[in-house]
Every structure is written in structure tokens, then in C-alpha cells.
Amino acid sequence: MLFRILIILSIALIQKTGDNPGKRIIFTEDFEQSFLNLNHWNYELGDGCPNLCGWGNKEYQHYTKENVFVRDEKLVIKATKQGDQYFSGRITTKDKIEFQYGTVEVKAKLPKGLGVWPAIWMLGHDIDENYWPNCGEIDIMEYVGRMPGKIHTTLHTKDSYGISKNTKITTVEEIETGFHIYKMHWNESQIKFSIDDQEIYTFAPTEKTAEIWPFDKPFYLILNLAVGGYFGGFEVDDSILPQEFIIDYIKVYKDINL
């Protein structure tokens, strides 16, 4: 009986997932439930005040639970405006799903229009003690409506703070149309990014000090849709609202020999 259980567990750990055979699954989220799984996710609410008003970027939105929901087995983060106030959503896996190394794969459809700023990103699990940017940040995908057709991938570190490096802007025709797959492969030596299985950027510094490479520890996932701000732009076209950032699935996996 024990042998049988071990075989079943081994098969589960080395299960094939779509185009990723022979991978060891760390985390998967396909939003089959009609509600957000709070065993995996946390809501981040409000405007960041008093400690981080505007979420550190002078963003306009207040985050609410109501602006994050599951519809047709997909996660929807919806940006809206009511009166003079913008609302949207942000969720994280902090303290629930954290991992070191592996591949993150997210299939998502972007919102569009001046002022929207969706992102798929990660922060070091020690951010509460080792403040940003020392904790490290991995931006798997950022898009801003003021720069249509372009995807931003960036690594934020103490070494790169205030300097435009460790970043890539990739032009993708019709990126706002339909779903696309954003992927980040991370190991002890490098971080690679791809869109629809086309590699776009690799960060592989030869020197790996804490200032350059704070990526040797667990990180957690963040999904959000901001409105306005330093990067999103301070001009918002209210006529395009509401807008939705839709996530079909999330997979985190490692090679079976890791």
C-alpha cells in the first residue's frame, strides 16, 4: 500500500501539463472555482496609505475585493471609475505560495487604453525586513496603455535603483488582442523571459552580489491592474473604462531533476 501511494505521489509530481511534459508542479491555478481561492491568494486593498500612498507610484486607484472576481473559469481584475474615484484590484500569494527558482507561466489578456497599467510580477519574501529594492523585484510582464504594442520586462535590484538597466521593451503586434503566454524561467544563474515561447530577454550577471542578484531566495506572485501613476501615465482616458485584465491560468513548475 505504501509503495502504491509513493507511485501515485510520484506521478502527481511529474505530471504532464499541456506543453510542459516531465515537469514538477510547484503551483497551478486554473480558476475552476467560482471564487478566488484564499488558500493561495491575498487581497491588497485601498490606496496604499498611510505608508505607501499611491502604492509608491502616485497611482490613482483604490484596490477593492469587488474588482477581483472569477468569471467563466478565468480571473478578472477590473478597473472602473465611480464619480471622481478609480477602483481596481491587486492580489498576491505572499506567505501562502512562495518559491525559489522555476518557471512561471501565465496566460492572460490585456486591457487597453490610456492610463491602464496591468502587471504580472514578483517580490522577495523578505520585503518586510529587507525593503524594496533590496528585496528584489521580477517584472514578468508590464504593459501601459500610453505605449501600445509594447511589453516591459524588468529586474529591480539595489544595484539598478534609479538607473534604467536590467530591462527590455519588446514590441509585439496586436498584443492587446486575445490571450498571450508570458513566461519567466529562473534558476541560480539567470532569469529568462519569453512571450508566446519567443525568448525576449535574459538577465545573467557574472557577479552575483546581494546588490546585483537578490534572487537566491523565495519570491511570491502579484497580479494587479493599476490606473495612472509614474509609469502608467498621469493622463487617463476615462471613456475607455471599464477595462479588464483577464488571466486564464497560472503555472509554476521545475524540471523533474531540480
Region spans (language model):
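A general, composition-driven signal for non-globular sequence regions
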Residues: L9-S10, Y182
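GH16 jelly-roll
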Residues: T17-L258
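Sec-dependent signal peptide recognition
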Residues: M1-I8
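N-terminal signal peptide
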Residues: S10-K16
